[in-house]
Amino acid sequence: MAKKMLNKVMDFLGLEEEIDEIEEMDNEAIVEGNEEIDNIFDSSNVRNQKGKVVSIHTTTSTKVLILKPMDYDAAIEICDNLKSRKIIVVNMTSLESKIAQRLLDFIAGASYALGGSLDEIDKGVYIVSPSNVEITNELKNELSTKGILNWTK
């Protein structure tokens, strides 16, 4: 402790070179770092560890639910399934138009908040998909570019 105090006083007065101390500290840090690296790459540690075999192919099954809601209360079930990353086909043809619109607005908001998508399949039939599923409609794209009857050949 007395040595530290003496060093501080000498440093304050500028009587001792700081370069020697910095070099000593750097050398100590290099030696400690080399010891840590040696411990990490010690061959006995590597041989004792067993490798893990991980299957690249995962067997996740995607579920598609087909629901025909009878009232507005079905919105909670639909949104819970969407949160569980399930694809839902919703048939709203049997609902009154005002209730169907409210239900559709609720589902669209939940889908947007979860990063999913809501697409109309047919009048009153919608597909709600989570963010990890992409829905494409190649027929719709083909019809928009070519037309229904291609008379311009």
UniProtKB/Swiss-Prot annotation:
Locations listed in the record: Cytoplasm
Protein name (Swiss-Prot/TrEMBL): Cell division protein SepF
Family membership: Belongs to the SepF family.
Keyword Phosphoprotein: no
Keywords: Cell cycle, Cell division, Cytoplasm, Septation
Gene Ontology biological-process annotations: division septum assembly; FtsZ-dependent cytokinesis
One family name in Pfam for this protein: SepF
